[in-house]
UniProtKB/Swiss-Prot annotation:
Feature: transit peptide: 1-25
Subcellular location: Mitochondrion
The protein's name in its UniProt record: Isocitrate dehydrogenase [NAD] regulatory subunit 2, mitochondrial
Keywords per UniProt: Magnesium, Manganese, Metal-binding, Mitochondrion, NAD, Oxidoreductase, Transit peptide, Tricarboxylic acid cycle
NCBIfam families: mito_nad_idh
Gene that specifies this protein: IDH2
Main location: mitochondrion
Length: 367
């Protein structure tokens, strides 16, 4: 072996052992003026919503994030969205939202659904993944559920045909099916995801879910580098419980996505730690990813021990959406450190910490 080759081999061994590894920061080159603080519409919401949105505000202030909030009082039992709310979101383009209670039965429509329709937030995204240090039913879970947000069973087209007989219409359109499929594949492409799975019940609803599947199949042909498969929704739920690691990106019609996202969240670590958001062509609303329990119990509200992790991670997603990647990374890293250390957790994660104690721990772990 020549002296030059020996020297090269020695250097390679040194690098492999870590003695000469030099870290290089990832550079984000902003445009002039990108550091200007951005307004964000804030909906504290119901139940524990004010607790967890306040947690986000405290952390944002501690890290001097270039955002400020415009709060609006909104509650799920209101008959309509309050005046000025939509105008604020349309002006700011971004909203952070706590949970809103949806009354069961009666004549009050869901403000969550109304907000999505008014702003055409056609894609719901929930990221379900294992957090290091947090025990879960399965390992190696990293699933993104992308759900069509504006039609399907949530179209709200119900009426009583005759006394005792109610008809509820499920609406599936080519336009909405294609755009949610395009969004799912685009998301997979931009985030280096390897597979998109379409969830359906086309074996029974042959026309409605058949149209959804047909749209997914057409879009899949335009992304040959991304694997594509299909699964019936009942089998999907069973497979999620048995082998969730097989899933990557899942694209679903409206109702199925709600069920699948909450199931995946429960498997990966609980609804209290899963981030998410709703996005359209112009606007985005970020909130706790999985809807189950997002307004909390009365005792949780009274004891002030609501889990702020999901909304903090959703806020990191929001910061990336606003093109503040370093702030997003700092926030996400701090939250994950607190979870991994295990000393400060709320009751739903097996601890006895208050919301404020978790906030203080996250702030202490900020770089």
């Amino acid at each position: 072996m020549s002296r030059q080759s020996f020297s090269l081999l020695k250097n390679l061994r040194s690098i492999a052992s870590g003695s000469k590894i030099q870290t290089r920061s990832v550079t984000y080159m902003p445009r002039p003026g990108d550091g200007k603080p951005r307004p964000v519409t804030l909906i504290p919401g119901d139940g524990v919503g004010p607790l967890v949105t306040n947690a986000v505000q405290q952390v944002m202030e501690a890290m001097h994030a270039p955002v400020y909030f415009e709060p609006f009082e909104v509650h799920g039992d209101m008959k309509s969205l309050p005046e000025g709310l939509l105008e604020s979101i349309k002006k700011n383009k971004v909203c952070l939202k706590g949970g809103l209670k949806t009354p069961v039965g009666g004549g009050v429509s869901s403000l969550n659904v109304n907000l999505r329709k008014e702003l055409d937030l056609f894609a719901s995204l929930v990221n379900c993944f294992n957090l290091p240090g947090l025990a879960s039913r399965h390992e190696n879970v990293d699933i993104v559920v992308i759900r069509e947000n504006t039609e399907g069973e949530y179209a709200g087209l119900e009426h009583e045909v005759v006394p005792g007989v109610v008809e509820s219409l499920k609406v599936i359109t080519k336009f909405c099916s294609e755009r949610i499929a395009k969004y799912a594949f685009e998301y997979a492409y931009l985030n280096n995801r390897k597979k998109v799975t379409a969830v359906h019940k086309a074996n029974i609803m042959k026309l409605a879910d058949g149209l959804f599947l047909e749209s997914c199949q057409e879009v899949a042909k335009k992304y040959p580098s991304i694997a594509y498969n299909e699964i019936i929704v009942d089998n999907c739920c069973m497979q999620l419980v048995a082998r969730p690691e097989q899933f990557d990106v899942m694209v679903t019609p409206n109702l199925y996505g709600n069920l699948v996202a909450n199931t995946a969240a429960g498997i990966a670590g609980g609804t209290g730690v899963m981030p998410g958001g709703n996005v359209g062509a112009e606007y985005a609303v970020f909130e706790q990813g999985a809807s189950a329990g997002n307004v909390g119990k009365d005792t949780t509200e009274e004891q002030k021990n609501a889990n702020p992790v999901a909304l903090l991670l959703s806020s990191a997603m929001m910061l990336r959406h606003l093109q503040f990647p370093s702030f997003a990374d700092r926030l996400e890293t701090a939250v994950k450190r607190v979870i991994a250390e295990g000393n400060c957790r709320t009751e739903d994660l097996g601890g006895n910490s208050t919301t404020q104690e978790v906030v203080d721990a996250v702030i202490a772990n900020l770089d």
